[in-house]
Amino acid sequence: MPKVDLQAIVKHCDRELRINEIVDYEDAHNGLQVENGGKVHRIAAAVDASLATICKAADMGANLMIVHHGLFWNPQHPWTGKKHDLITALIENDMAIYSAHLPLDLHPRHGNNAGLCKALKLKRPK
């Protein structure tokens, strides 16, 4: 299976989604949140980076998840309990996490709102 450099994908997503131009919530972090070993052979997408979605992505053979709701939202607390399980699953599966919250909401072509407008066949949405 061919592999692609993780940083090449990150650069592409950062540029396409204008990660550095969109101001998000104070503690939200858009972009690469967790690195893997540096190579990507399959990408999974999910709304949330949860233990369930990470395990499902790993079961599908993915080692990069692109998510709308990433891991970092609030000032961080200790990674114990469920958070420990989540980080363990990421490491054991060499899974990278890339998150785009408001950049994905606002994107005129790839964004969630753009997709919804297209699905509803809305003409000239504002």
List where the protein language model places each region:
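Hydrophobic structural segments
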Residues: 1-126
